[in-house]
Amino acid sequence: MFRTSVRIRDYMIRRPVLVRADSDIFDAIRQIINHRISGVTVVDEHRKPVGILSELDCLGAILSGSYYGEEQGVIKVEDFMTSPVETINVDENIIDVAKSMLDHKRRRRPVVDENGHLIGQVTCRALLKAIRDLDIPDHKPT
């Protein structure tokens, strides 16, 4: 059975890529491509998470106008991000967070301090590393 005392603080990304809700979607797309990530946390002016923008959200933003041949001007992140966003704190248990992310089909969760300010992010990849690092007595590598 898993040793379940591993906490989010041990595996969170401490400097996640961020965008503002009022940012141009193409600026967010550049961030996603340049950092080779599948999405970003969207924050307000106080670094409080207000949404998540995924690659699929970005595709939807691009296709929503171009498919119909519409001139859209500036497409804002806030119009396509997933919101509201569920956040977690640094002391939450890795296994509990992994189960919640799986149940809600989410690839990332913002980590906030006691005032709701973003201090990090946990991703599915980070959770996989955490679970790999746990003691699994019956598992033999192949």
Give a label for each model feature.
Residues 19-36, 43, 88-105, 112, ...:
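The conserved cystathionine-beta-synthase
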Residues 1-15, 54-87, 93-103, 118-142:
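Tandem CBS (Bateman) regulatory domains
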Residues 32, 40-57, 101, 109-126:
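A glycine-centered beta-loop-beta connector
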Residues 27-38, 56-64:
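Short, charge-rich amphipathic segments
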